Amino acid sequence: MVETDLPFLRRHIDEPTVRAAYLRSYLRRLGGTVRRNYFDQAVTALVETERELRGDSHASLPASVRIGTPAIAANDRTVVPAAAPADTAVAAAPEQPATATDAEADNGRVAIVGGGLAGSLLALSLARQGVGVDVYERRPDPRLGGDAGGRSINLGLSKRGIQALTEVGLIDEVMPLSVTMRGRVIHSPDGGTRFQPYGKNGGEVLHSIDRNELNRLLLDHAQRHPQVRLHFDHRLAHVDKDRRELELESNGERVRVRPSWVVGADGAFSRARQEMQRGERADFQQEYLEWGYKELSLSALPDGGSQIELEALHVWPRLHGLFVSHPNRDGSHTLTLFLPFEGPDSFATTTGEAEVKALFDKYFPDLVPLLPNLVDDWMSHPTGSLTTIRTGRWHRDDWIVLVGDACHAVYPFYGQGMNSAFEDCSALMAALARHGQNRAAAFAAYEQSRRPHTDTLAELSKANFVELKQKVKSPWFVARKRLDVALNRFLPKTWLPLYTMIAHTTIPYGDALARAHRQERFLAGSAVGLAGAIGVGAWLWLA
């Protein structure tokens, strides 16, 4: 009870709208998160006030005072707008649905749906700019144990991701968690190997990093920031776009929050995207690869050394299967096998011990002695699927925007999924900085700057699947790649291989592909250049 309100209440206690307005003002003074028991306490306080003023121990509030009671369920939580002055509250009209302006009064906090790599990085980026952030993640806290939900746990960090991590001051902590990969080691069916460097010098490398370890680091730093609150086991159930309200499920309860604005960073099967696009004119395309994947482990030697070359991405290319290996800091390797879902020698036909051994004896005989737990790992590890997602629009007005896989999931074969998601965060922050308070313009500019290029990345990722599966073992392909490296060495500012532009620069994906096409046309259009290319390529191949 606020003493300064007593004189006014004594004069106007018989007016139900005054009592209702007072109750609303009381609730606003509570601030923050209001549960049902707090609401009940407020009602009780107001009843006691009436009794005190009337000297009536049996006074009770009429139904008109209980405005809003049915709207706050026993297990709900809602963010209530900040308090208005007492005289303003008294003059307020009868209760109306909350508006966007009311929601923004909650200290301007942003809700990020999804606490994975992109969500946790963006939370930290916003917090460093003084923005309050609430991260809602449907899974339990990954720092307390568990796995990555069946997804590949090793990722290739390259220039775009490095740039984003540098912007938030974390790159010096991330790099020690990674293993440098200087190129590919191609394993032939006969057991032979061939090394293909990633670039023309030792600086053009990739970095293998454990997804879970990186996610834990980002969450730790986000949680340490006073502007960030992390909420695990919170699944987005519904988005009320008109009221600008999120409804989440947590431990069997429904929670309603009303942030200033929302970021959907909840992955390829994004609930935020589904809710944002519900009832809207939106484009959406989802494409599954007819191949799936299964993860296996190649353990380190007893002394901690690696059974195969550590500082490389290992590839076993086969027409009917593809093995890729990422190194780990402890000397082990995470192997990912890609196979067709159906047909001969597929996941559908490789279900028992005999079939597993026969598959490896046929396609990957050099791996068999290195994998003593092959059958057990095969039986215990799930089979995952791969999807490409393209959609539009990526935002709605100035209130909700998507980043990462939620708006552009790609196949993993170019190693750019995480890097492009991190680049989204950088691009969104830059757009917000350029457009100031005009968030709708910032969201539109962000999408315009990114969507054409992530669409290009989707096509590049598909094409690289064919490259890894078939082309990397071709002498002509290898000679062409070496020619690219040689031309880049002699003409570093003029000739850039496509892979160099994608992995080792921040040139937008679409611009990189367009430049690569121009270079190809120039080379093909010059008889002298073509003859020289063949000669140089042959020399490099034989060298």
Name each region found by the language model.
Residues 220, 225, 234-238, 243-386, ...:
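Conserved FAD-binding catalytic core of PHBH/FMO-like flavoproteins
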Residues 102-116:
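Beta1/beta-strand and adjacent pyrophosphate-binding region of the FAD-binding site
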Residues 146-221:
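Active-site-adjacent segment of FAD-dependent monooxygenases/related oxidoreductases
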Residues 115-128, 264, 296, 382-463, ...:
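Conserved mid-domain beta->alpha element of the FAD-binding
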